């Protein structure tokens, strides 16, 4: 479909324009499990501002299940350290509102209110592979569940 790396759209919005379709009609497969993305997953992909990836010139997204799984694997393999909001601002030398911080679970960019919530509740931000992570409002309440034996 897209052979030249220069012409490959990187965002879902740009891909829709290139294919002359809309976000409501585009069909993508998951890059990991190869299953077609459900409509809600396409919307989540766009809302999370994730990047379209290409395999053999074909565009792929990622389904919710694979995204959460890969996020957890990345956390386990590439966790560096955690800091409080004030320390993060001093380290990066930028205010929190200018720092890209994604949700550690669903990878959505955190809005200013979600970042403020971390500071107000004295919760830490995590450095994973050189990128900053916290929890969005939707994932805030979801906790790791222990399996009963």
UniProtKB/Swiss-Prot annotation:
InterPro entries linked to this entry: E6, E6_sf
Primary subcellular site in the record, as a coarse category: host cell
Cellular compartments annotated: Host cytoplasm; Host nucleus
Motif (PDZ-binding domain): 147-149
Domain of life the protein comes from: Viruses
One of the record's GO molecular function terms: PDZ domain binding
Keywords (A to Z) from UniProt: Activator, DNA-binding, Early protein, Host cytoplasm, Host nucleus, Host-virus interaction, Inhibition of host innate immune response by virus, Inhibition of host IRF3 by virus, Inhibition of host RLR pathway by virus, Metal-binding, Modulation of host cell apoptosis by virus, Oncogene, Transcription, Transcription regulation, Viral immunoevasion, Zinc, Zinc-finger
Cellular component annotations (GO), alphabetically ordered: host cell cytoplasm; host cell nucleus
Gene Ontology biological process terms, A to Z: DNA-templated transcription; regulation of DNA-templated transcription; symbiont-mediated perturbation of host apoptosis; symbiont-mediated perturbation of host ubiquitin-like protein modification; symbiont-mediated suppression of host cytoplasmic pattern recognition receptor signaling pathway via inhibition of IRF3 activity; symbiont-mediated suppression of host type I interferon-mediated signaling pathway
Pfam families referenced in this protein's UniProt entry, alphabetically: E6 (PF00518)
Span of zinc fingers (unnamed): 30-66, 103-139
Something else known: Belongs to the high risk human alphapapillomavirus family. The cancer-causing human papillomavirus E6 protein has a unique carboxy terminal PDZ domain containing substrate.
Subunit annotation: Forms homodimers. Interacts with ubiquitin-protein ligase UBE3A/E6-AP and thus forms a complex with human TP53. Interacts with human NFX1 and MAGI3. Interacts with human IRF3; this interaction inhibits the establishment of antiviral state. Interacts with human TYK2; this interaction inhibits JAK-STAT activation by interferon alpha. Interacts with host DLG1; this interaction leads to the proteasomal degradation of DLG1.
Family the UniProt entry places it in: Belongs to the papillomaviridae E6 protein family.
Chain's role: This protein may be involved in the oncogenic potential of this virus (cervical neoplasia-associated virus). Plays a major role in the induction and maintenance of cellular transformation. Acts mainly as an oncoprotein by stimulating the destruction of many host cell key regulatory proteins. E6 associates with host UBE3A/E6-AP ubiquitin-protein ligase, and inactivates tumor suppressors TP53 and TP73 by targeting them to the 26S proteasome for degradation. In turn, DNA damage and chromosomal instabilities increase and lead to cell proliferation and cancer development.
UniProt protein name: Protein E6
Organism of derivation: Human papillomavirus 33
Gene: E6
